[in-house]
Protein backbone atom coordinates (compact mmCIF):
# COMPACT_ATOMS: atom_id res chain seq x y z
CA UNK A 1 0.00 0.00 0.00
CA UNK A 2 1.36 3.41 -0.95
CA UNK A 3 1.25 5.59 2.16
CA UNK A 4 2.22 8.86 0.48
CA UNK A 5 0.17 11.32 -1.55
CA UNK A 6 0.60 10.87 -5.27
CA UNK A 7 -0.15 13.06 -8.22
CA UNK A 8 -3.83 13.32 -8.95
CA UNK A 9 -5.57 15.34 -11.58
CA UNK A 10 -8.37 17.75 -12.30
CA UNK A 11 -11.97 16.68 -11.69
CA UNK A 12 -15.07 18.57 -12.85
CA UNK A 13 -18.22 17.70 -10.89
CA UNK A 14 -21.82 18.79 -10.48
CA UNK A 15 -21.85 19.06 -6.68
CA UNK A 16 -25.24 18.20 -5.16
CA UNK A 17 -24.40 17.97 -1.43
CA UNK A 18 -21.67 18.96 1.02
CA UNK A 19 -21.20 17.41 4.44
CA UNK A 20 -18.83 17.59 7.41
CA UNK A 21 -18.14 15.32 10.35
CA UNK A 22 -16.05 16.09 13.44
CA UNK A 23 -14.33 13.15 15.11
CA UNK A 24 -15.19 13.03 18.80
CA UNK A 25 -11.92 11.24 19.56
CA UNK A 26 -9.45 13.49 17.72
CA UNK A 27 -11.44 16.64 16.94
CA UNK A 28 -10.40 16.33 13.30
CA UNK A 29 -12.90 17.63 10.74
CA UNK A 30 -13.75 15.38 7.81
CA UNK A 31 -15.59 16.79 4.80
CA UNK A 32 -17.13 15.30 1.68
CA UNK A 33 -19.04 16.33 -1.41
CA UNK A 34 -21.60 14.30 -3.27
CA UNK A 35 -21.86 14.81 -7.02
CA UNK A 36 -23.59 13.60 -10.13
CA UNK A 37 -21.50 12.77 -13.19
CA UNK A 38 -22.10 11.10 -16.55
CA UNK A 39 -21.01 7.47 -16.81
CA UNK A 40 -18.26 7.22 -19.44
CA UNK A 41 -19.13 4.94 -22.36
CA UNK A 42 -17.84 1.42 -21.84
CA UNK A 43 -16.85 2.09 -18.23
CA UNK A 44 -19.26 -0.46 -16.77
CA UNK A 45 -20.36 -2.77 -19.51
CA UNK A 46 -23.54 -1.31 -20.94
CA UNK A 47 -24.28 1.22 -18.17
CA UNK A 48 -25.63 4.54 -19.45
CA UNK A 49 -26.72 7.74 -17.78
CA UNK A 50 -25.40 9.34 -14.62
CA UNK A 51 -23.90 8.16 -11.35
CA UNK A 52 -23.75 9.59 -7.85
CA UNK A 53 -20.24 9.75 -6.40
CA UNK A 54 -18.85 10.93 -3.08
CA UNK A 55 -15.40 12.45 -2.65
CA UNK A 56 -13.38 13.45 0.39
CA UNK A 57 -12.52 17.15 0.29
CA UNK A 58 -10.43 19.61 2.30
CA UNK A 59 -12.92 21.19 4.77
CA UNK A 60 -11.75 24.74 3.99
CA UNK A 61 -13.04 24.44 0.42
CA UNK A 62 -16.68 23.96 1.40
CA UNK A 63 -17.31 27.67 2.09
CA UNK A 64 -16.81 28.53 -1.60
CA UNK A 65 -19.51 26.07 -2.74
CA UNK A 66 -22.81 27.95 -2.56
CA UNK A 67 -26.00 26.26 -3.72
CA UNK A 68 -28.63 28.48 -5.34
CA UNK A 69 -31.46 26.00 -5.80
CA UNK A 70 -29.51 23.70 -8.12
CA UNK A 71 -26.30 21.66 -8.28
CA UNK A 72 -23.08 23.67 -8.66
CA UNK A 73 -20.52 22.90 -11.37
CA UNK A 74 -17.09 22.87 -9.70
CA UNK A 75 -13.61 22.05 -10.94
CA UNK A 76 -11.20 20.61 -8.38
CA UNK A 77 -7.55 19.62 -8.24
CA UNK A 78 -7.17 16.23 -6.59
CA UNK A 79 -4.50 13.93 -5.21
CA UNK A 80 -4.52 10.31 -4.14
CA UNK A 81 -3.49 9.88 -0.52
CA UNK A 82 -4.11 7.54 2.40
CA UNK A 83 -7.28 8.32 4.32
CA UNK A 84 -8.88 6.68 7.31
CA UNK A 85 -12.58 5.93 7.33
CA UNK A 86 -14.83 5.95 10.40
CA UNK A 87 -14.05 2.26 11.03
CA UNK A 88 -10.30 2.87 11.19
CA UNK A 89 -9.45 1.34 7.81
CA UNK A 90 -6.79 3.17 5.80
CA UNK A 91 -7.11 3.22 2.02
CA UNK A 92 -5.64 5.28 -0.80
CA UNK A 93 -8.41 7.64 -1.82
CA UNK A 94 -8.83 10.51 -4.27
CA UNK A 95 -9.11 13.71 -2.21
CA UNK A 96 -10.18 17.09 -3.59
CA UNK A 97 -7.53 19.56 -2.40
CA UNK A 98 -8.05 22.78 -4.37
CA UNK A 99 -11.06 24.52 -5.88
CA UNK A 100 -10.13 25.74 -9.37
CA UNK A 101 -13.52 27.00 -10.62
CA UNK A 102 -17.12 27.38 -9.43
CA UNK A 103 -20.00 27.67 -11.88
CA UNK A 104 -17.55 27.85 -14.77
CA UNK A 105 -15.79 30.91 -13.29
CA UNK A 106 -12.13 30.40 -12.33
CA UNK A 107 -11.28 31.04 -8.71
CA UNK A 108 -8.87 33.95 -8.26
CA UNK A 109 -5.62 32.87 -6.60
CA UNK A 110 -5.90 35.87 -4.27
CA UNK A 111 -9.25 34.59 -2.97
CA UNK A 112 -7.50 31.63 -1.38
CA UNK A 113 -4.37 33.50 -0.24
CA UNK A 114 -5.77 35.86 2.45
CA UNK A 115 -5.80 33.13 5.09
CA UNK A 116 -2.01 32.99 5.09
CA UNK A 117 -1.25 36.72 5.49
CA UNK A 118 -3.79 36.98 8.30
CA UNK A 119 -2.00 34.21 10.17
CA UNK A 120 1.30 36.04 9.66
CA UNK A 121 -0.26 39.32 10.78
CA UNK A 122 -1.44 37.66 13.98
CA UNK A 123 2.03 36.35 14.81
CA UNK A 124 3.42 39.77 15.91
CA UNK A 125 0.48 40.40 18.23
CA UNK A 126 1.56 37.85 20.86
CA UNK A 127 5.04 39.39 20.79
CA UNK A 128 3.51 42.80 21.50
CA UNK A 129 1.29 41.52 24.30
CA UNK A 130 4.13 40.30 26.51
CA UNK A 131 5.70 43.75 26.25
CA UNK A 132 2.44 45.22 27.53
CA UNK A 133 2.36 42.59 30.28
CA UNK A 134 5.91 43.53 31.28
CA UNK A 135 4.73 47.10 31.83
CA UNK A 136 1.85 45.80 33.92
CA UNK A 137 4.27 43.64 35.89
CA UNK A 138 6.52 46.64 36.55
CA UNK A 139 3.69 48.86 37.75
CA UNK A 140 2.65 46.56 40.62
CA UNK A 141 6.33 46.23 41.59
CA UNK A 142 6.64 50.02 41.63
CA UNK A 143 3.64 50.30 43.96
CA UNK A 144 4.94 47.62 46.32
From Swiss-Prot:
One of its GO terms (molecular function) is DNA binding. The keyword DNA-binding applies. Residues 134-144 have a biased composition (Basic and acidic residues). Residues 108-133 have a biased composition (Low complexity). Residues 106-144 are annotated as: Disordered. It comes from the Viruses. The keyword DNA-binding applies. GO terms for biological process: DNA replication. Keywords: DNA replication, DNA-binding. Belongs to the inovirus G5P protein family. Binds to DNA in a highly cooperative manner without pronounced sequence specificity. During synthesis of the single-stranded (progeny) viral DNA, prevents the conversion into the double-stranded replicative form. G5P is displaced by the capsid protein G8P during phage assembly on the inner bacterial membrane. Homodimer. This is DNA-Binding protein G5P. It comes from Pseudomonas phage Pf1 (Bacteriophage Pf1). The gene is V.
Amino acid sequence: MNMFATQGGVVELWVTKTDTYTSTKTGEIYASVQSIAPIPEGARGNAKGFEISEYNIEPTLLDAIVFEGQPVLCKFASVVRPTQDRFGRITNTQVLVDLLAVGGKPMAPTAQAPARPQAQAQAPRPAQQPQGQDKQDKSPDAKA
